From Swiss-Prot:
Keywords: Metal-binding, Ribonucleoprotein, Ribosomal protein, Zinc, Zinc-finger. PANTHER family: 60S RIBOSOMAL PROTEIN L37A, LARGE RIBOSOMAL SUBUNIT PROTEIN EL43. InterPro entries: Ribosomal_eL37/eL43, Ribosomal_eL43, Ribosomal_protein_eL43, Ribosomal_zn-bd. This is Large ribosomal subunit protein eL43. A zinc finger (C4-type) spans 39-60. One of its GO terms (cellular component) is ribosome. Belongs to the eukaryotic ribosomal protein eL43 family. One of its GO terms (biological process) is translation. The gene is RPL37a. It comes from Ostreococcus lucimarinus (strain CCE9901). Pfam families: Ribosomal_L37ae. The lineage of its organism: Eukaryota, Viridiplantae, Chlorophyta, Mamiellophyceae, Mamiellales. The keyword Zinc applies.
Amino acid sequence: MAKRTKKVGIVGKYGTRYGASLRKVVKKQEVSQHSKFFCDFCGKYGMKRKAVGIWSCKGCNKTKAGGAYSLNTGGSVTVRSTIRRLREATEK
């Protein structure tokens, strides 16, 4: 069978509806939410989305709260880097 969605990928299900720019934004979110992420607990790429904001690892069965479409949100990355920077400053 021929591959029908070479350019559009996962958003091919929407056809020509909703406009190209909106489908491009949705594609980024849907690819992110269906991909596997790195698990901080066991070190494997096994974190998958179970529901909105709930992520679980297939390797170690740990469940973690995260973002709606990706495991780490922009705010959580900023907070984590700030905490690490402050921790290193107090250790010196």
